[in-house]
């Protein structure tokens, strides 16, 4: 309209006059003029890569369909594509997934300052575990309590349990599973040097729970009150457990739930990718650390 000629004066109306009559901001007009024309591609200049966007979309869909876990972001899809021999940059994978509605759904909340500037992630396994509980419903037996124990170094599930009761003895079960699995036996002092992170629930703070943990040689490390970030490793696994099992399936009995939890923990340890460990699975990280520890022992024996 600003380039149209006035029939009276045979001159252009001009952008300022049109904006004033239409009561719109000239800044908005100039900003819209700077936007890319609709026929112009938003792609970065240069070679496309080994496959086109359509082919890459097909590869991404195959990886999503083949995975039995939900909620994985574009970085883990990029890693799975790389393992499958499909090379593409993480930014391109994210763009293609966004354009095709394949990104994991998430909520954008308000950003605020967080005082938790430390870390609860350990460098090696068997230095700190986290334990927590959640609840679900079975059809025949009603409410069921789910207890987990998770390794802080590699996010590995080392113990998982379900029961009708949520008392201190049931809360101990995943910890005892982890001790037997990682240290080979249930005996006094067998897990010396290990810390256990838990919240201030009455079952975890009870005398029986604390005495049993102390007997095994474990140092209790409760998180701060009303600060779930302190037990974030266990909290994050419970979110994954809900998104991939508890919210997707129904169970008739607690025993059926317990069997499903054991199977899910096995599959999780073998297939879940941990980004901070180079997109390796928890089982791979533990196996690599075990091999390094054995090599260190062999070197000491040779040196002696």
What spans do the regions from the language model cover?
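RNase H-like polynucleotidyl transferase catalytic core
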Residues: 18, 107-111, 196-200, 214-233, ...
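C-terminal domain-tail junction helix/linker
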Residues: 46, 207, 214-218, 240-304
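Basic, flexible linker segments flanking DNA-binding modules
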Residues: 19, 26-128, 227-228, 281-290
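Two-metal-ion RNase H-like nuclease active-site motif
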Residues: 126-136
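Residue-level signal for the short linker/turn that defines the boundary of a DNA-recognition helix
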Residues: 12-14, 72, 88, 252
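Short, amphipathic alpha-helical "recognition" segments used to contact nucleic acids or chromatin
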Residues: 1-13, 57, 61-68
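Active-site beta-loop-alpha junctions of metal-dependent nucleic acid enzymes
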Residues: 138, 142, 160-187
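Acidic/histidine-rich, metal-coordinating catalytic segments
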Residues: 175, 187-205, 224-228, 280-282
């Amino acid at each position: 309209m600003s380039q149209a000629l006035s029939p009276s004066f045979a001159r252009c109306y001009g952008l300022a006059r049109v904006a004033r009559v239409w009561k719109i901001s000239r800044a908005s007009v100039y900003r819209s003029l700077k936007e890319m024309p609709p026929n112009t591609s938003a792609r970065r200049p240069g070679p496309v890569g080994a496959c086109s966007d359509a082919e890459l979309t097909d590869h991404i869909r195959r990886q999503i369909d083949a995975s039995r876990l939900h909620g994985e972001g574009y970085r883990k899809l990029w890693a799975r594509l790389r393992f499958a021999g499909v090379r593409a940059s993480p930014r391109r994978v994210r763009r293609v997934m966004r354009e095709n509605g394949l990104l994991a759904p998430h909520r954008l909340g308000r950003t605020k300052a967080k005082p938790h500037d430390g870390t609860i992630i350990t460098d090696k396994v068997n230095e700190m575990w986290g334990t927590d509980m959640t609840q679900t419903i079975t059809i025949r037996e009603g409410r069921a309590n789910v207890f987990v124990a998770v390794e802080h170094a590699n996010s590995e599930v080392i113990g998982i349990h379900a029961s009708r009761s949520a008392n201190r003895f049931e809360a101990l079960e995943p910890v005892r599973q982890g001790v037997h699995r990682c240290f080979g036996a249930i005996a006094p002092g067998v897990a010396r040097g290990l810390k256990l992170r838990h919240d201030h629930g009455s079952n975890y703070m009870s005398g029986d729970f604390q005495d049993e943990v102390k007997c095994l040689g474990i140092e209790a490390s409760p998180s701060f009150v009303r600060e779930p970030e302190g037990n974030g490793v266990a909290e994050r696994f419970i979110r994954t457990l809900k998104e991939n099992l508890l919210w997707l399936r129904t169970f008739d009995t607690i025993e059926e739930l317990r069997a499903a939890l054991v199977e899910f923990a096995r599959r999780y340890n073998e297939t879940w990718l941990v980004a901070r460990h180079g997109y390796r699975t928890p089982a791979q990280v533990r196996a690599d650390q075990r091999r390094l520890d054995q090599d260190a022992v062999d070197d000491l024996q040779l040196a002696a």
